[in-house]
């Protein structure tokens, strides 16, 4: 299982448009690449059906059927901790800790051997320090330490994971 996890680093007290739009942009990526979508530290909803309804009703990004397909397949998760079955945590960052840095080649191996959760921080601040420390690996997607806008990073990371998985299947 591969989990694409959006980490709320914006406001935790009030739902903002950026929350909904980021989720709306992640849904088609998860649908296309057969990932689960986890939302970490999003206290605005009681259940995932509320999330899907709010995203579908508020945004015009993507085909709503993708969200409902993920929902019906139990592939959207509201979490405030990381269940063991989500596997290894992989922080996405332009500044990986050298000791935790995960190369593309290593990613191919890791995702073919076990479940993984890729953490994507929303906003300029990136992932909180505690999650960076908890993550088993750090993945830098550009190969050059370039900081990307959040939704651009989501697309790059999702596509990179997909290609790593395809390569792993062929080995």
Describe the predicted segments one by one.
Residues 34, 86-87, 114, 134-136:
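Short, well-ordered alpha-helix to beta-strand connector turns
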Residues 7, 12-14, 116, 130, ...:
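Residue-level signal for well-ordered alpha-helical segments
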Residues 19-25, 104-108, 154:
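Well-ordered, non-membrane alpha-helical segments in soluble/globular domains
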Residues 127-171:
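Structured adenosyl-cofactor binding patch, chiefly the S-adenosyl-L-methionine
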Residues 49-53, 103-104, 152:
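Short secondary-structure transition/capping segments
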Residues 14-15, 47-48, 99-100, 127, ...:
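Secondary-structure boundary/capping motif
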Residues 1-95, 162-163, 169:
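RNA substrate-binding interface of SAM-dependent RNA methyltransferases
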Residues 93-131:
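Long, charge-patterned amphipathic alpha-helical coiled-coil/hairpin "stalk" segments used as oligomerization
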